[in-house]
């Protein structure tokens, strides 16, 4: 039997992001990935718009920061992912997208 363990330093920002989503009724799913956590907005299915990770291979992991895929300005960033983001920075984009696509918060 094997167990997956999330490194404590990789959990802080994903859990803060999940807390912000909960407080604002923004749907998300959270799970373990490569020794860290992944937060998917709004789901982890093919309907996923964006996700944020902090794990063994993510940009920003040494500082405990998030790497985001989706809702990234690929032209400005030069990549399909953007790293070294705080939970607040990711949440700001998710919240804006949620309001733009659903009209009101949490509905």
State where each predicted segment sits:
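Mixed-charge, Lys/Arg-enriched low-complexity segments
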Residues: 2-12, 16, 67-107
């Amino acid at each position: 039997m094997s167990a997956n363990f999330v490194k404590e330093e990789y959990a802080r920002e994903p859990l803060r992001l999940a807390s912000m989503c909960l407080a604002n009724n923004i749907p998300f799913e959270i799970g373990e990935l490569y020794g860290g956590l992944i937060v998917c907005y709004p789901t982890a299915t093919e309907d996923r718009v964006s996700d944020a990770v902090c794990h063994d291979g993510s940009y920003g992991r040494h500082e405990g920061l998030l790497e985001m895929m989706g809702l990234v300005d690929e032209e400005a960033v030069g990549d399909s992912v953007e790293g070294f983001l705080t939970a607040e920075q990711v949440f700001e984009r998710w919240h804006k997208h949620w309001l733009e696509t659903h009209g009101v918060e949490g509905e």
